Structure formats: C-alpha cells, structure tokens
Amino acid sequence: SEMCIRDSIHTPQTICGRLNDMLDLARAIDRYIVFYNGPRCGASAPDHMHFQAGNKGFVPLEYLWSDIYREQGEAVYRDGDILLGRLKRWPQSVFFVESGQMDRIAEAFDLLLRLLPVLNGDTEPMMNILCTYEAPVWRLWILPRRTHRPTQYYEEGDKQRLISPGAIDLSGVVPLPRKSDFERFTKEEIVDIFMQVSLTSEETNRICKEWRKI
C-alpha cells in the first residue's frame, strides 16, 4: 500500500528544514519506506509539502540493499556513529547515510545539500530521497538529479515514453501509464533514462571528495 502525508498548512514542497520530519516519520511508521520527490522530480503535488510512504519490500534499492551494497557500495566517510557512502554502478547517482543519531544524519545531509548544484529557477537541488528506520538505525538514500524528464518524454509516435521518474522509478520499479510504453521499454532504455536525469559521474566524484570532509 502507499500513502501520502501532507502538511496541514500550505507550504512549498521542499526538503530544506524538513529532514528531521522525514526521519521522525520513518521511525513512527517503521513498517514503511518514506520517500520525498522534489518539486520537479516526480512529486505528486509539486507545490504543497508532502512525503509519501509505501510498504517495505517493494523497491529493489531497499529490499535488495545488502546485495547492492556488497556489490557496488563505497564508503565515503565512516566513524563509530555514521556511514556516508555512494553506489558505484547504479545508473542513477545514489548517496546514502546510515546512523542511529538524527543530528549526525542532519549534519551530513546539510553538507551534501550545499554541495549539490541548484539549477536556475529552483530553490533547492533537484533530488529524490528515500528513508527507512530499523531500530536503532536510519538509512537515507539521496538521489540527486539534473533534469525533470528524459528526452524520450518529448518524442512523438513510437519513440515517445510518458515517464517523469520519481523516487520509486529510480529505486527500481517503473510504473507506466500506457500499456504501449510497457510493451516497448527495454532495459537499455530505462538505464539511459536514469542516466539522463541523474548527476554525471564526474559531478558525483567531485561531490564525494568534498562530502568526506564532514
């Protein structure tokens, strides 16, 4: 099942100043994975603050995490309280944070937020975020990006694909509104779409060098 958790007051969709809310929510409903889609990153209500949540065991990035981390995880920084890392071979740029201390997670996230590029007209870096809580540890995945939609979205005829990837898509489950897209999609095209919307590997490497200075 999936749910939407909206702010009762009309406020913009932004993660700035709201990460602790996300961590608190993940702890309160720890049977679920909580996710955040930026305003131009697949958000269902791009102008109103909300998180979404779904059952754990639904997206591969979460339920296959131990295998994924073993095969392509790379620690960027580690001490007794926190682990910062990234995935080396996921088609989409992925940073992750693991810690049992909310303040350390917030510190690491705030630094990453300052390192990520902000595009013209945006108020925060484009990103999707997923969060789980397995007592006593939170795990946060941050998926930074550089564009809202892939070129395939704007094609015509058989080349068009109606996809605006959000957190769920980039974590390995790609819901499609049209049967024709489902029938034509190839693995290679999905990888291409993920890479189009993601930060480049060069940008990711640069950010990692700075992020480890926490």
Locate predicted features.
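Conserved His + Asp/Glu catalytic blocks
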Residues: 8-20, 25-45, 54-214
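Short, small-residue-biased leader/transition segments that mark boundaries at the very start
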Residues: 3-5
